């Protein structure tokens, strides 16, 4: 799950990580009130969307007067904003964050993430903040410090200080960085997060470190343990189809192609998309109905796939292990009838009760195209959309 910047900063503050004072606003007048409550300025007005790169898209403004605050907020609120990190999707700006604008002397980068390669929580730090870390890694990799944390020992203060020394910080700042890193480690573990990013972690004119911008992602599989995080979810920032899928315990990701996919099992779903690509087609989605698929879930899955008018064919690829092929076949038949599917449906069944499942499809009276295997199914799906 993704979070807004203001939500990330709320969590940072709870764990003692220094952040500038700020308030959110949903109107230009509220933004002015927020600015006045923060002092005499200057201020930053920042659009709240689930994407980075807001500055280049006009979503971050430096304001010296309350009139400028009002104008900046009015320009952002109620619009949709696309950035180079939003994958071409324009996200609605429903809130702005108004914060104090401190004088920055240096921008750093600091993040915490799960490194699957080393099977550890890993810190990435750089003396080059305020820019994409990917660019720094490609152009000046020597400016990046990494630290893999031992799960048993946890992060130790000396490790944070070592990172600070390598970043060229002064003694006071080294100690501040160490404390921030320990707080981030606690936050990361307490809330089951998958990413924390401070970019920039800035040194202000008084020599202190502040998290001027923050990004966090949490592990969706652990959300049930954190009702306080679930309450922060902003569904307006998410794809409507993906929201509906999550509410029905379906794993769904929208893609750009025209061949809808319904598969049981994430691995088989990815393999299905690969085979479609190998045969010259483009998948319209990733959809894993899971091992506990029911008629109702299959019907919902069809509705999800067909919610996109780009879909010109549907490839159903089921391996019956836990789930029975005859039950899936009944679900497909019921769904096609209920939803009124108008596009070709290609079905490949294999596994438990496969013969019974194929018989049900063959005698259903529906124009369902059978497939012998995954490659045959992919070829027939591609042929259906190119016919």
Curated annotation (Swiss-Prot):
Q: Which GO terms are recorded in the biological process aspect for this UniProt protein?
A: succinyl-CoA metabolic process; tricarboxylic acid cycle
Residues holding ATP: 46, 53-55, 102, 107
Q: Which residues form the ATP-grasp domain?
A: 9-244
SUPFAM superfamilies in UniProt:
Glutathione synthetase ATP-binding domain-like (SSF56059), Succinyl-CoA synthetase domains (SSF52210)
User: For this protein, what does the record note about how its cofactor is bound?
Assistant: Binds 1 Mg(2+) ion per subunit.
**Listed cofactors:** Mg(2+)
Record's GO cellular component, any one? succinate-CoA ligase complex
Which residues make up the binding site for substrate?
264, 321-323
Keywords in alphabetical order, please: ATP-binding, Ligase, Magnesium, Metal-binding, Nucleotide-binding, Tricarboxylic acid cycle
Name its pathway.
Carbohydrate metabolism; tricarboxylic acid cycle; succinate from succinyl-CoA (ligase route): step 1/1
Task: Give the protein's biological function.
Answer: Succinyl-CoA synthetase functions in the citric acid cycle (TCA), coupling the hydrolysis of succinyl-CoA to the synthesis of either ATP or GTP and thus represents the only step of substrate-level phosphorylation in the TCA. The beta subunit provides nucleotide specificity of the enzyme and binds the substrate succinate, while the binding sites for coenzyme A and phosphate are found in the alpha subunit.
Subunit relationships:
Heterotetramer of two alpha and two beta subunits.
What's this protein's family per the entry? Answer: Belongs to the succinate/malate CoA ligase beta subunit family.
Listed name of the protein: Succinate--CoA ligase [ADP-forming] subunit beta
User: What is the protein's species of origin?
Assistant: Xylella fastidiosa (strain M12)
